[in-house]
Amino acid sequence: MLKKFNNYFSLFLILIYLSGCVSAVIGGVATVGIATVQERSLKDSAIDLKLELQLQKKLFEASKDKLFAYVDVIIIEQRIMLIGNVESQEVRDLATKISWEVSPKIKAVLNELTIGGKTTLVSEAKDVRISLSLSGLLIGDVDISDINFSHSVSKQVIFLIGIAKNDDELNQVIYHARTIKGVRKVISHIILKNDKKRM
């Protein structure tokens, strides 16, 4: 899995956030070119980034051994998706509780954390291969605006989240995920651009 890299990167962003430089990060990411194809507004993108930094910080402070090192966080339009592996139902529930407490702006917490059964290096390598394959397929498909979708892979299960412009795009993203060799399951939290959940 890409968890360790993502978590180290998040730590870097947390340090930037604590030093008051988060606006520089947001400014660097929010380019005009991205704004023309991204279903999320620049305001929502900025809010999501700030919320992710805050949540990663809280998970780290709560117990880095139990939560932070094994949990991926993806936030799109204030909908949080938690992916990874934790040691008990208590820790899983705590992750949900902490997520809701981050901000009143949170609209949903999609807790996809599994309990027990630590991953092996072989399993993590498979997850990385699957993740890279999916990214390549989405980028290479001219009918998909890949910037509107995020994913995480845990134990060869692909978790999708994002905003599709229509049913065709949504189904095509899921199709690509399912066709990758070695994928055990695909779980989608993708919504359509006209979904009431976005209101």
Residue ranges, per PLM feature:
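N-terminal targeting leaders
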Residues: 2, 6, 17-199
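Classic N-terminal secretory signal peptides
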Residues: 11-14
